[in-house]
Design a protein with these regions (language model features):
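Catalytic active-site module of serine/aspartate enzymes centered on a nucleophile-bearing elbow/loop
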Residues: 339-377
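Alpha/beta-hydrolase fold nucleophile elbow
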Residues: 173-187
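Short, surface-exposed "cap/lid" segments of acyl-processing enzymes
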Residues: 89-133
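Alpha/beta-hydrolase active-site loop
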Residues: 150-175
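Alpha/beta-hydrolase-fold enzymes
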Residues: 194-279
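Short beta-strand/loop motif that positions the catalytic acidic residue
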Residues: 297, 303-305
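Fungal secretory targeting signals
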Residues: 1-19
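N-terminal cap/lid segment of alpha/beta-hydrolase-fold proteins
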Residues: 19-91
Length: 377
């Protein structure tokens, strides 16, 4: 049952798919965060965007440090678009909250492709009895949008994820309360999740970071491989986002950044290019703000990334020269940043690219995640 119409606006109807009941939600939240102030104008032209990413990908450079001139408090009332799913028999014992990465919206976790073959939500709910909550990150999709440099940054988005979690734990959305909540992230969503549990270590009972590592050396490959352009240059997005947003400018860019060679169906690439979303320069400038420091989180922690991940492995997670060959793969190097995690696991998925859920190897990734959560949460 719903508790408060003032706090929740329901979509017109629930969606019944297989053995689950799903409902689209629009959830108002009051947020405050300490954001960076960057000395850069909104990116309006293709030259603006290209120059930005050339500076971002510059070897030995740190564009965020170069541009930051201080910090300020950002506050406001926003709305978050989400989808809540439970098994037909009723809510599961554990709620999984999932946060997507750059270029996606919440459909990343439940894409309607090939009879939901690539849906992590379907596996988690239908086959394993979990409840799930997917959401469009603040600034993306059907959630509130905002100013693209100094408002929509990782700090405000972490505040949104924390508030969303509290609303479900405290029964202010549905009367059912969850005593155990786990957080899953992909890419930027993993960086958010990492920051969330470092800031609020008791907010989660376990985390899964997909498409993630603690190696920043390869972000320039993603920045330049994405062929980013102003959102006005992307017909499918131009009417949905304001000036200042950016998005991938070609299907080959999406292929480069998200798919491993021979590990994907071309129809999935087509779907992703047609349904891809925009992002803000403010997000890109702050994505590294939560990493590089030891995390205080003490719960079960899984880092799982594709072998051919471009931004976090440079296209080969087993090439370890960037860390002086200290571990057998780049994902295992994350362990030192989780000194309190119990347990910690690092897994590399063979052949998979950065878009872990969308490759032929997705089944192995899903099995690994669900086995970890069932064993430890």
């Amino acid at each position: 049952m719903l508790q408060s119409a003032a706090l929740l606006v329901l979509a017109a109807a629930s969606n019944v798919v297989s053995a689950r009941w799903c409902r689209d939600l629009t959830i108002p939240v009051s947020l405050t965060s300490r954001n960076a102030v960057f000395d850069i104008e909104p990116l309006k032209t293709e030259i603006d965007v290209t120059n930005f990413y050339l500076e971002l990908g510059r070897q030995g450079g740190n564009l965020a440090d170069k541009l930051v001139k201080g910090y300020k408090t950002v506050s406001g009332i926003y709305t978050l678009a989400a989808t809540y799913c439970v098994p037909d028999k009723g809510p599961g014992d554990v709620l999984q909250i999932m946060t997507h990465g750059v270029g996606f919206d919440r459909s990343y976790w439940d894409p309607p492709i090939d009879d939901y073959k690539y849906s992590y939500v379907a596996r988690a709910v239908d086959d394993h009895g979990y409840s799930t909550l997917t959401w469009d990150r603040l600034g993306v999709g059907k959630s509130s949008h905002g100013e693209t440099i100094n408002e929509i940054q990782i700090f405000l988005e972490i505040a949104a994820l924390a508030e969303l979690t509290r609303k479900f734990v405290n029964c202010t959305v549905f009367e059912h309360s969850y005593k155990r909540v786990v957080h899953l992230g992909h890419s930027f969503g993993s960086a958010m999740t990492y920051g969330l549990v470092n800031q609020y270590p008791d907010i989660s009972n376990g985390i899964v970071l997909t498409g993630f590592s603690q190696i920043p050396a390869y972000m320039g490959l993603f920045a330049l491989g994405g062929n980013f352009v102003p959102v006005s240059s992307v017909p499918s997005l131009a009417s949905q986002y304001a000036e200042g947003y950016v998005a991938a400018g070609s299907k080959s860019a999406v292929h480069t950044n998200f798919f491993g060679p021979d590990d994907f169906d071309p129809a999935v690439l087509d779907w992703l290019y047609e349904h891809g979303q925009a992002n803000t320069p403010g997000e890109i400038l702050t994505v590294g703000a939560t990493g590089g420091v030891a995390n205080v989180f003490h719960g079960p922690s899984l880092v799982i990334t594709g072998e051919r991940d471009v931004p976090f492995c440079g296209g080969d997670c087993y090439a370890t020269s960037a860390i002086q060959n200290k571990t057998s793969n780049l994902i295992a190097a994350s362990e030192e940043f989780f000194p309190n995690a119990s347990p910690f696991n690092a897994t590399v998925i063979p052949k998979a690219g950065h878009g872990l859920n969308l490759g032929y190897s997705a089944d192995l990734a899903f099995d690994t995640i669900l086995e970890f959560l069932e064993a430890h949460v």
